């Protein structure tokens, strides 16, 4: 199944894709990669997974069978052999991106340029449905945005989003290698010193233009406090996002819509909802599935709603298939707002 069909379906109903269609899509993608992608072709020959058996039952059962079939990718192998995950002769427009490197050495993964369109449809629909941004920004009241972040997918994604609202964007690239370690060991002042060019440029922009939208990480939100009266939307993700910080922001940026996102280099940003003191994030079906899992009685199982488990991804696109665990735990949370599927909540890093 190619991007033409995928984009057609997502344009019609980006946040309400049926489970039956997701299963059909996943089955097609697994078959394609088992035949055409070096890594998965090798796995298929070695393990002989029975796709007819794996794709029986509901989506939860399918997800569990994928992991119990031994299909999870080793993180160290992925970091050293990323080219093995590109389909032979793939005709699309591929770009390789890097992870942020805030926690460990950067990983490398690839996107087809058309995936940016899929991701944008999901982001735009979710932000409009949950936060009503389409009511805030239009041709009469333009979005004027500033964003901090690493170059690559992050820059491409936020650019498309701002432009879709008829806005203009200042993108300030930042070096993120080891940022979490610096924050943990030396504190916020050390982070700001490390990012001094970003700090200076941000102040210059804020003093000159009338910025009404910001996209940044928690340690950098203090840069915008002097201008909080004019900031209508703040999109926040990355190191340091937690309940205490979010409540502090709510008290400081009183008239600002605060939007939490969960970012990952292989699939981009997922939209979050802050409710009852928890952050709930929802993947962009059908290309990204996320469930917390536990290993019990010799098998991987998705946890019950409200319980915590290790975060597991299935990323399925024409250009890449990835089945993996993260060194992170999260709660399984029920559908909420416009989302018709389960999400994951309050992720916590669990460095192994």
Kindly label every feature range from the protein language model.
Residues 1-24, 28-29, 167-352:
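Active-site glycine/GP-rich loop and adjacent strand/helix microenvironment
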Residues 39-43, 157, 222-224, 244-245:
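Phosphate- and divalent-cation-binding pockets in alpha/beta enzyme and binding domains
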Residues 119-145, 179-188, 197-207:
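Conserved ATP-dependent adenylate/AMP-binding module captured primarily in the ANL superfamily
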